[in-house]
Every structure is written in structure tokens, then in C-alpha cells.
């Protein structure tokens, strides 16, 4: 599905990513965990063609993404929810979704399917998105990314600033997408927010991959203590 191999990226003369490698299989949830500024978001942006990488290879379904314009990446079946819930705040929930559906032949059918996944959004279909709660806005951002019916979904800190009840709803949505065979690569700073949904966790520190394990291995308290003591999360 997704292969990232020896990814290297510089900003000016500063190395941001240092030979990052990992694989993501169909229906798998992989979390990049690390503190702010570790390089996690740069990995997502590199996949989306928003940041150039100096060396390395990115493959999606055996197709090379390196050098592909960001405009064409979503057309290959890759959805992206950036940090900050970038919505059209002056538009309604429905209008935000319809923008995401503009290029879809079966837009109404897709919209109905998405709204059935997010009952809260269905209840607020005519509400101005800027008046939604933070959790509801995150749901809408996720729902809009699903308008292209992606095979791969990139999520940048999807639980940031959310109440526990909303975090639970976002996790349930991720698990439902996983059941449908969607692969998910997500970025988080808080380990407790993602362990219930992640199959694998990779810790990124100073642009390097320093640790990886299955979520079951990561739940081991001794392992957590060792890793957290090392990177200071």
C-alpha cells in the first residue's frame, strides 16, 4: 500500500528528516508519535507533495509519488486532514461536504454514506461550520477528507484539543474506516489518545525514527517507561 524508504528532507541547511522508513498495509492504522517539532507533520506533507524531500522514495500502490504535484495526490486516493481543521467556516456543514464532492460522479450517494457515519453532522447539516464545537469541526474535516473515498487517509493530530467524549467518537470513526479497508497514517503527541486504534506505533525524535512496536508491545508499562524516559514526552 504505502512505502516510505530512507526519506530525507532539509529546511535551508537544517536536516528535518533523517532516513525515515516504514510500510503501511491495507486496513492498517500506523501512528507517528513524538513531541512538537519532531518531524511528524513533515512526513505527512512529503507524502502529499506539499514539501519536497531531498532523498528517499515514496510509493503508493507501487506507484512513485516522489515529484508528483500536490494537486494530483488526492486523485490517487489519498485523503489528508491537516492540523487546524481547515474548513470553510462561513459555509454550512453540507456546503463544506459538497465542495469535497465536486469531482465525484456519485456525490449524493457518497454524501449520504458519510453522513451516516457521522450522525452529529447529519443533525447539524444546515449549521454554519464556524459555530460547531471543536470536536464537531474535527468530524467535519474528517468527513470532508472522505468525500474522495480514499484508500489511504493521513490525519495530523486528529484528537488535539478535544474532550474525551469527542476523542472516543473520532477513534470509533477510525476503527470503522479500518474495517472498510482504509489505511490510516496518523500523527499524535499523546500516546493514550491513539493506542486503542493503532496497529503500530513509531516514535519520531529530531527527524529520526528511534523506536517502533506494535500497539500491544507499546502498552507494556516497562517499555513505555523506557521510551518516555528517553525522549522526554
Residue ranges and their predicted role:
Residues 33-35:
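The feature captures the beta-strand-to-loop junction immediately N-terminal to the Walker
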Residues 153-157:
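Catalytic Walker B motif of ABC-type/P-loop ATPase nucleotide-binding domains
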Residues 56-65, 76, 109-110, 116:
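Conserved ABC transporter NBD signature motif
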Residues 48:
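Helix-to-loop junction immediately C-terminal to a conserved catalytic motif
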Residues 145-146:
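ABC ATPase C-loop
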Amino acid at each position: 500500500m504505502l512505502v516510505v524508504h530512507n526519506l530525507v528532507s532539509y529546511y535551508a541547511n537544517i536536516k528535518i528528516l533523517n532516513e525515515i522508513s516504514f510500510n503501511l498495509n491495507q486496513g492498517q492504522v500506523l501512528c507517528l508519535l513524538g513531541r512538537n517539532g519532531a518531524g511528524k507533520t513533515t512526513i505527512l506533507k512529503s507524502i502529499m507533495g506539499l514539501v519536497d524531500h531531498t532523498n528517499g522514495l515514496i510509493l503508493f500502490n507501487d506507484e512513485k509519488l516522489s515529484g508528483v504535484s500536490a494537486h494530483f495526490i488526492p486523485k490517487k486516493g489519498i485523503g489528508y486532514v491537516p492540523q487546524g481543521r481547515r474548513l470553510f467556516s462561513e459555509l454550512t456543514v453540507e456546503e463544506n461536504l459538497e465542495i469535497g464532492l465536486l469531482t465525484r460522479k456519485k456525490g449524493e450517494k457518497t454524501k449520504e454514506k458519510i453522513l451516516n457515519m457521522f450522525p452529529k453532522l447529519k443533525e447539524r447539516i444546515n449549521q454554519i461550520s464556524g459555530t460547531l464545537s471543536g470536536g464537531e469541526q474535527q468530524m467535519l474535516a474528517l468527513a470532508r477528507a472522505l468525500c474522495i473515498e480514499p484508500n489511504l487517509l493521513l490525519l495530523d493530530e486528529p484528537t488535539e484539543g478535544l474532550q474525551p467524549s469527542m476523542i472516543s467518537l473520532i477513534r470509533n470513526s477510525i476503527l470503522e474506516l479500518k474495517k472498510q479497508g482504509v489505511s490510516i497514517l496518523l500523527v499524535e503527541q499523546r500516546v493514550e489518545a491513539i493506542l486503542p486504534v493503532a496497529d503500530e506505533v513509531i516514535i519520531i525524535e529530531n527527524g529520526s525514527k528511534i523506536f517502533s512496536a506494535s500497539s500491544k508491545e507499546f502498552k507494556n508499562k516497562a517499555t513505555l517507561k523506557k521510551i518516555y524516559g528517553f525522549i522526554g514526552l
